[in-house]
Amino acid sequence: RHTRLQGDWSSDVCSSDLKSLSDLRKFLTTHGFEHFQAAHAKGKGVIFLTCHVGAFDMQSTNMAFHGVKLSVVGTPMKDERLNALLQNYRNAFGASYIERGKDNIKLIKELKLGNALAILIDQDTKVKSRIVNFFGMPAATPIGATILAMKTGAAVVPCYIHLNDKLDQHMHIYPEIPLVNTGNEEADIVTNTQKFNDFIETAVRQHPEQWVWMHERWKTKVGEEVR
């Protein structure tokens, strides 16, 4: 079923007919945009916390059409042709791209300007991580979003997108996740990353057939994570 759904949402992502928000609204409904607005009003930037559920890249297009100045933070794909196609798609609709781990100063500048970053944390990659719980098992989870939020005061706004039974897209934006700040930096990194992971798990549980189960999410063992 995942493969069939992937074909359905890929056709939406690759649509060349998108010219405006009204075009997007023909097949995509946004829920909770007011939560982004409330977080953005604080003036310290917004980190969209999201995951590889559904047509996840369409979220950046949606927010760009809503007037949000957004950069997607991610790791390049191994296939250069597919990577170029994806970047062209993002740029065409107003979102920019920042390679994970290559320009941290730019990430901070974007947040200080009051702009938004979109960061996916549901994959086990070779970046700074902490072991936290995910579906009852220890999982190496990237801490970039956690560190940025703790250092800059940016609001962390969770979101995800999914395809319903009628093949309509639905993007859900939720209230800001409050950060824990006890003064113990390492403990706070772990606690906040766990809170973020809890949201991701909830999103995946809502639509498990639309998550990227082919990824080796639990491949890194405790003590092997990049620190």
Give the predicted meaning of each segment:
Residues S22-L28, T75, A92-I98, F135-G136, ...:
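Short, flexible loop segments at the rims of nucleotide/cofactor-binding pockets, characterized by
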Residues F36-Q37, S60, L86-Q87, L107-I108, ...:
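Short amphipathic alpha-helical segments and helix-helix/interface helices
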Residues R1-V13:
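Single conserved hydrophobic/aromatic residue that forms the stacking wall/gate
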Residues S10-T50, L86, G94:
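Membrane-anchoring hydrophobic helices of lipid-metabolizing enzymes
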Residues H40, F65, G101-R227:
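Non-catalytic C-terminal accessory region of glycerolipid acyltransferases
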Residues L28-T30, D79, Y97-R100, P138-A139, ...:
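A conditional alpha-helix N-cap/helix-loop micro-motif detector
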Residues K42-G101, L113, V127-R130:
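Catalytic core of membrane glycerolipid acyltransferases/transacylases, capturing the structured
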